[in-house]
Amino acid sequence: MSKRGADHQLTKDQDDSDDDRHGPVEVPKEASADVMATRKIAKPKSRKRPTSGVSSPGIFANLAAKPVSLPASTTQFTFGKPAVTANNDSDIHLKKRGLNKSFIDAVIKSVDNNPFGNLSPLFDEYRQHFSSIEKKPAEEQPTSNAVVSEVNPQQQKSQDSSSFVTEKPASSEKEDKEKPLVPPGAPRFGFSAPALGSSFQFNSSAFTPKGSFGEKSATEAEAKEKETSSNQTATGTAATTTNQFSFNTAANPFAFAKKENEESKPLTPVFSFSTTMASADASKETKQTHETKDSKSEESKPSNNEKSENAVEPAKGNTMSFSWTPDKPIKFDTPEKKFTFTNPLSSKKLPASSDVKPPSAAAVGFSFGTTTNPFSFAAPKSSFPTSSTPASVGAEKSEETSNGNKSEQEEKENGNDETRSNDSLVSGKGKGEENEDSVFETRAKIYRFDATSKSYSDIGIGPLKINVDRDTGSARILARVEGSGKLLLNVRLCQDFEYSLAGKKDVKVPAASTDGKSIEMYLIRVKEPSTAEKLLAELNEKKVSKSEN
């Protein structure tokens, strides 16, 4: 689109010369009819498709307006077997093969869905189809086994090209009613499941029991005689029968019946799912006689060489029999238990010994023949001396909070424990103690004063001794870790140092440091206040005796 051109040059002196307000105004004029005819008026594009040509029908063609009909077609849709068969025998064999394959598939599918279902409807339907195939039709008409729908050219014009619904002529209505879509002789390969109402329905004879587990009725004997007679007649006429898949005749290739040399033995169908009970109360009788039958299972079962009158023997080659008889019920024996997982403590009790005493209810940990508690802070009484005893950290607190007899008993036990724990350490002397005598022994807890935190820190607990040298008479305090014998405290007594009580059970002991440049303060805590007083007296006495010597 080009810009409108100017009539003259625009300058600063003539800037208002193009203003339309000062000049004449052009009035629009209406165009004439000739001018309008020459002009082309643009119209918006239409979404409708042009009707020219034939368009392919869509899936919703029936809902829309009917388009132009296609030319008449003479196509025929034939459903069924062809009108003329080249070889009738080959067609029959193909039908039989297809029927057998469909039957096997139907049986497998039914067993997968319900292993305990009734397959008799499938067998009946199979026999019906097989017999219909065997019967040769009298005359085969070209259109007897086919359903032909011809397209009428006149009717095609009024119908949609994509519609599959064809109107039937008025003249053929009667013929359609008379003629079935599928002739009765044609095979049908559909194995539909039976209705729910008749799935597990038994005949009236099935609900009227014919025998019990322990007795044999007369009706059962008659039924067996009929079966034997029918089987004997079936073996004689096996060559003339045409049924190839029966369960009652011995000449069928798929029959599971007895052999010819065993005609005297009564035969029963292999796949027999019906029960032969004597009365409705047979279930009660089975519960009463179940225990006696289990104990006499060997007597009730007939052997291979013996023939029992009451027992019904299956075929010789039969290994999968689902039927049962009153004298030979189905029984699942429980396997013999080879491995028994039992608690040995529940079966055999350990012999009680006078030396071994059971642990008390308050015992904690592992106890092997003793009543000691290795994880308690206050060790109990024991008659056996040991080299190490558990730590009694909370012994002081438990003593103060105990009542009456309990506190006295703990004092006796702690006293015995203290004597027992110090026996081995006091009697055995360590390195450097060969020429020394121990004048005082006790069990104590050692603390050291920390200058940074300005408090006493625990360094260990163990036996404490005051040893005096035999030659020089000098005394020292020696303490080791309980159990391991690690050295905790080894200080010489000095006359210039002052030893005093810091509490009822605590004794303050100053000592020179290892480098000799400073003084370290130790705190010895014992169990009894009297022990603390004795310790303080020994310290003051031995430091004086050292200076006098």
Curated annotation (Swiss-Prot):
Provide one Gene Ontology cellular component: nucleus
- Note the Gene3D superfamilies from the entry: Pleckstrin-homology domain (PH domain)/Phosphotyrosine-binding domain (PTB)
Q: What is its main location?
A: nucleus
Q: Tell me which domain of life the UniProt entry assigns to the organism this sequence originates from.
A: Eukaryota
Would I find rRNA-binding among this entry's keywords? no
In this chain, composition skew of type Low complexity spans 229-244
Q: Where is the composition biased (Polar residues)?
A: 141-165
Q: From start to end residue, where is composition biased (Basic and acidic residues)?
A: 1-32, 170-180, 217-228, 282-310, 328-339, 407-421
**Family matches, as InterPro entries:** NPC_Nucleoporin, NUP2/50/61, PH-like_dom_sf, Ran_bind_dom
Tell me the residues on which Phosphoserine occurs: S17, S347
RanBD1 domain residues are 416-549
Q: Where is the composition biased (Basic residues)?
A: 40-50
Intracellular or extracellular location(s): Nucleus, Nuclear pore complex
What this chain does, per the entry, is described as: Functions as a component of the nuclear pore complex (NPC). NPC components, collectively referred to as nucleoporins (NUPs), can play the role of both NPC structural components and of docking or interaction partners for transiently associated nuclear transport factors. Active directional transport is assured by both, a Phe-Gly (FG) repeat affinity gradient for these transport factors across the NPC and a transport cofactor concentration gradient across the nuclear envelope. May play a role in mitotic spindle formation and/or function.
Q: What PANTHER family does its record include?
A: NUCLEAR PORE COMPLEX PROTEIN SIMILAR TO S. CEREVISIAE NUP2 (EUROFUNG)
> Which protein are we looking at?
Nucleoporin nup61
Native organism is Schizosaccharomyces pombe (strain 972 / ATCC 24843) (Fission yeast)
Gene name on record? Answer: nup61
